[in-house]
Each structure stands twice: as structure tokens, then as C-alpha cells.
Amino acid sequence: MKINNNSLITPVLLAGSLIIIITFGIRGSFGIFQIPIENEFQWLRIEFSLALAIQNLGWGIGAPIFGALGEKFGDRKLIIAGAFCYVIGLVLSTFAESPLTHQILEFIIGFGIAGTGMGMILAIVGRASSDKNRLMALGIVTAAGSAGQMIGA
């Protein structure tokens, strides 16, 4: 959807920035829980680290899938689907009692991040921005991701 006005601050920019802040804020906090989880469950540090690496694989695998499906079904539906995967993975991970379960759920979380992360949001904001403000809008969303990581950590 193309916006015809030259306004930099648009509802799409604000919503996209908020989604990125939340997505990367939560993701940025995972490292804080490594030692408490390690101590509570007696997991090796490598098992927790592997789970986060698997999360990145889920993100990488999911990004082109969400991108392709976004073209077919629309951005809004795919962001909702991504958020659903993200939330389901987060909620179920609170019940994970083995490293393998945690790693599988981190894949689901990563897949959800693909639907709510930079690839989807930057594409949406870029399409909705005027030619005059597109680069600034994309920069604002990217900065929102960094702010989310700082807030989450």
C-alpha cells in the first residue's frame, strides 16, 4: 500500500517500530536467562547456546517463507502468524524440561521472529513510505530494533 502524502511519521512506521521493539526486546533478553536456567535444570551451557543457534536457524529458514507467503496472503496475516509462532514458542518454552525440548521450541520462536522481524517490517514500512522519506523511515525502524535489544537486555 503506497502512502501518497510526504509525512515521515505514519501509522505503519509507528506500528512497525513497536513490533520491532517488542520482537528484539524479548529476543535480546534470552542471554540473561542462561545462567539461571543452567543452574535450575543442570543443563550444560552449550545446550542453551545451541538452542539460541537453532533459533537463528528457524529465523533464517522462516524469513523467505514469510516473505513469499506475505506476497500471497498479505502482510497483516503473516505478521499475526509470526507473532502467534513467537508467543506459542515462548509460552511452551516455560514448560521445557529437557534441552531437546527447549531447542525445538527455540526453532519455533525463531520461525516466529521471521514473521515479526526486520525482513517483514522493513519491507512493509518501505512500501508504505513516500520516496522522500523512505530511507529515514527504514533507519528509524532499524534503530527501533536496536532500542528493543537495549531495553530487553
Predicted segments with their positions:
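Residue-level signature of mid-helix packing/kink "hotspots" within the transmembrane helices
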Residues: 28, 56-64, 149-150
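Hydrophobic core of transmembrane alpha-helices in multi-pass small-molecule transporters
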Residues: 101-116
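Conserved MFS/SLC helix-loop-helix module at the cytosolic interface between two early adjacent transmembrane helices
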Residues: 61-99
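Intracellular juxtamembrane helix-capping segments at the cytosolic ends
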Residues: 37, 115-129
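Glycine-rich segments within core transmembrane alpha-helices of 12-TM secondary carriers
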Residues: 135-153
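Pair of pore-lining "gating" transmembrane helices in MFS-fold secondary transporters
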Residues: 7-29
